Amino acid sequence: MKKFSILVCLSCLCTSFSYAQVIDCDDPTSSSLKKICSDQFKDIRQKLDTQSMTAFLISDAPQRLLVDTHQLWLNRLQQCKSLACYQQQMDFRIDDLNFYTSLNQSLTQHYLKFEHGTIAKQPVHLQVHQLSKDKIKIEGNAYRSPNNRIETQTISFLAYTTPDQKQNITDNENNCHYQFNFQKAILSVKSESKACNRFVGVYRVYD
């Protein structure tokens, strides 16, 4: 029984390690991966691997969230057209992993926008934080091109509400009004304003 438990633990560690490897440089298949796998980025790749492994081992964030946000980030990284962009995106991912590792995720629900069963091509990540018994904070980002200036790479979302007023939400960043429909596995977001449609859609919950 003891040997079996050890084997199970080792299996879990190996699975986590395979997911935690940020970039596979054994056989880079694209020109962008070849740039990322160059010696110039060796130190930050190692830092990313370490931080990713730490997140998988000790974060209370759902592992599926770590996997899917990694893929989302990797897709964005491969859109980069400059070395500065690569560096910037890797720094951003380290910050994200630090967030998942250092903060209590048990009071936060994460949502990624999905289209046709996969993560949306124009990704959106919403987070619903239970700040207290009577206060909820909803924040998020709609991602744009990583080649934009830093201040235009994302569209921010920020709202505060209460548990009994979670359906009608006003985004303080853009003064947009939304109807949030929280269900067991998904979140549906609607708006009557076409100017606010960037956050409209169906989201998968990670818990």
Q: Where are the regions that the model predicts?
A:
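Contiguous, well-ordered beta-strand patches that form the walls/edges
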Residues: N75-L77, A142-K184
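N-terminal glycine/threonine-rich, aromatic-flanked beta-hairpin/loop signature
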Residues: K121-F157
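Amphipathic, heptad-repeat alpha-helical segments
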Residues: D24-D26, S32-L66
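Sec-dependent N-terminal signal peptides
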Residues: F4-C14
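Mid-chain, structured segments of secreted extracytoplasmic proteins
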Residues: F56, P62-T101, Q165-N175
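Edge beta-strand at a domain terminus
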Residues: I150-D164, S191-D207
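Sec/Tat signal peptide C-region and signal peptidase I cleavage site
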Residues: T15-A20
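Tryptophan-anchored aromatic micro-motifs
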Residues: S102-H125, Y203-Y206
